[in-house]
Amino acid sequence: MKLYEYLLEGTKHFTLIDPDKSVDYLKIARYALEAGTDGILVGGSLGIRESQIAQVARDIKSVAHVPVVIFPGSVSQLTEEADGVLFLSVLNSLDPYYIIGAQVHGAVLLAKHYPRLEVISTAYVIVGDGGAAGFVSMSKPIPYTRPDIAAAYALAANYIGFKALYLEAGSGAPQPAPPEMVKAVRKAFPRVLIVGGGIRSGEAARAVARERPNVIVTGTLAEENPEKLGEIVKAVKSA
């Protein structure tokens, strides 16, 4: 089964592992797998080399029975050791580089050097606090009080033809995107919807999952309190 087809099936939980933050990334991966996570995202906003991302993906693939997907913070974070890559365009960045500049560079690299990697075009929309991703990409995060603006971006992503949309509250966000915003984006975008950032409890995960995104991502929690992943995964799958 293709990765994209897998993502379309119901609501799944993915664990984000940032090798720049997680020295013992295999320990986190094992916790996530035992908790029942449906996939692993690998990547981060800062400080990761191509050789590092390749080694991490290879190591995780050796113990994982779920897809390993690159969540790139730069064009250097590519490897065929993974199953696929979210080909991100930061729609609400104020810098054209993060909307299309990096993508032109990355597209050439993918075509020449990583032809077997499944590429999923992904509209990346940063909301709320925005975290490191919002800061690095020079974005103007959408306030949680304006789900209508998030929905407008989702409509644009749909009409442009993105295969996926990632609604990002940011790494370590104090709160996740509110259910009202997820609902509005879900209504406007009919393909793969990914929601991440600020999800630290089963209750928060369940509230987001009820709006039927395709993927719910937890990252900071996996780094700081991996024992709690089971609660999150259970909430996602029981919503």
Swiss-Prot record:
Per the record, the GO terms for biological process are:
glycerophospholipid biosynthetic process
Query: What cofactor does its activity depend on?
Result: Mg(2+)
- Which superkingdom heads the taxonomic lineage of this protein's source? Archaea
- List ligand-binding residues for sn-glycerol 1-phosphate: Y166, L167, E168, A169, G170, S171, G172, G197, G198, G219, T220
Query: What function does this protein fulfil?
Result: Prenyltransferase that catalyzes the transfer of the geranylgeranyl moiety of geranylgeranyl diphosphate (GGPP) to the C3 hydroxyl of sn-glycerol-1-phosphate (G1P). This reaction is the first ether-bond-formation step in the biosynthesis of archaeal membrane lipids.
Similarity comment text for this entry: Belongs to the GGGP/HepGP synthase family. Group II subfamily.
Among HAMAP family, the record links this protein to: GGGP_HepGP_synthase
Q: What is this protein called?
A: Geranylgeranylglyceryl phosphate synthase
Task: Give the organism the record lists.
Answer: Pyrobaculum neutrophilum (strain DSM 2338 / JCM 9278 / NBRC 100436 / V24Sta)
